[in-house]
Amino acid sequence: MADQLTASRDGAAGHDAPRLTVRLDSFPHGGLAAVFGATGGIGAALGAALTDSGRFDRVLGFSRCGDLSFDLTDEASVATAAETLATCGDIRLVILATGMLHEGTALPEKSWREVDAERLARAFAINAIGPALLLKHLLPRLPRTGKAMVAALSARVGSIGDNRLGGWYGYRASKAALNQLVHCAAIELARRAPEAVCVALHPGTVATRLSAPFAATSGVAPVEAARHLLGVIDRLDAKDSGGFYDWRGTPVPW
């Protein structure tokens, strides 16, 4: 099914070209959408696109700094963020756009000789444990009827079946763990809210600070990546819950 798009125009100076907006007609009108990791390249673009859609009463962005701040590695902070969101209305769509490929000068491992316990623990804390805590505190707050979704941004390199190159031990393993956590949560969610969806999404190569040092090509702009992802989100329904999909909506091997 093709993305449902309408043209909108940014009236700000220097941004006169029309841009395409995903309408998200599969969601009930109103309620809330939220992006966790809202200040990153993809997160910021997703927040803007969700606002442009006009589908939701409010679009909230959570990040490490700002008015709606939270700490992904602190469960009390995660729980408070989820409670704050729930008090604002029905939660219809949450996108987890958090993630870490590497920190500082410590680049992704090319060999088992570079595996380090602290770096592995940090990768799992950000890429798997933090999102698991968000799932724990957000999924019980989704409406029991009507389409609602939590979508976690994963990565194709987290696919075990698609791994032909090796390397990147911490990032690959932590994203694979995220995929399993999403799948488990989706099974439990279906018992509580049969129309709800919980999925992992691969955004493709996007031109952000995270991918810049490693991408063979420049990647797509965050605005374009956001449009692709929201198009997939609009098309997915309860029968797709628990899956892992790329930016085209194609299933990615586990």
Region locations from a protein language model:
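C-terminal helical subdomain
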Residues: 196, 200, 208, 212-254
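Hydrophobic positions on the long internal alpha-helix
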Residues: 134-138, 142, 181-182
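Catalytic loop of short-chain dehydrogenase/reductase
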Residues: 100-104, 108-124, 144-192
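Conserved active-site helix of classical SDR/Rossmann-fold NAD(P)-dependent CH-OH oxidoreductases
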Residues: 48, 132, 176-187, 223-230
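Rossmann-fold cofactor-recognition segment
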Residues: 63-80
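N-terminal Rossmann NAD(P)H-binding glycine-rich loop of SDR-like oxidoreductase domains
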Residues: 36-49
